[in-house]
Amino acid sequence: MKESILAVLLYLFEYYFSENADLVRDRDSLQNGLIQVGFSPAEINKAFEWLDALAANRPTLTHPRVNGPVRVFHGPELDKLDVESRGFLLFLEQQGILNTEQRELVLDRAMALDQEELDLDDMKWVVLMVLFNQPGAEAAYAWMETQMFGNEPEPLH
């Protein structure tokens, strides 16, 4: 069974992190649970490395920049990220849901995935996982979660 890092991350996020946030699990028990549901140890390890890099690269700036430079995507980013996902990132930054450092962290984590291409749905999951890991980003996370799962999202002010 060929699985991707994103599939492992989505499974972790859906079954361990979001609904059971109070549940403390060590890496070994998480890995055993993932193996039991059919993920390969290699993909599980890559997913844990992805999460470690996410935790290690938390942005320090908590206030969004106003009227900053426009992000220009380049070579590998253009190849991997479709037009909708790139536009979505710019939209999130313009709306103040992501600041520039968070946007760059989302891009870093998206580029670290083992998929050749990421579509809009994949990008939304990456954004959600990054915001989940960001202290002080609760409102942005809630907005993004509503955008993905709920009714019409409320404007974020």
UniProtKB/Swiss-Prot annotation:
Pfam families: DUF494 (PF04361). InterPro entries: Smg. Transmembrane segments: none annotated. It comes from the Bacteria. Belongs to the Smg family. This is Protein Smg homolog. It comes from Xylella fastidiosa (strain 9a5c). The lineage of its organism: Bacteria, Pseudomonadati, Pseudomonadota, Gammaproteobacteria, Lysobacterales.
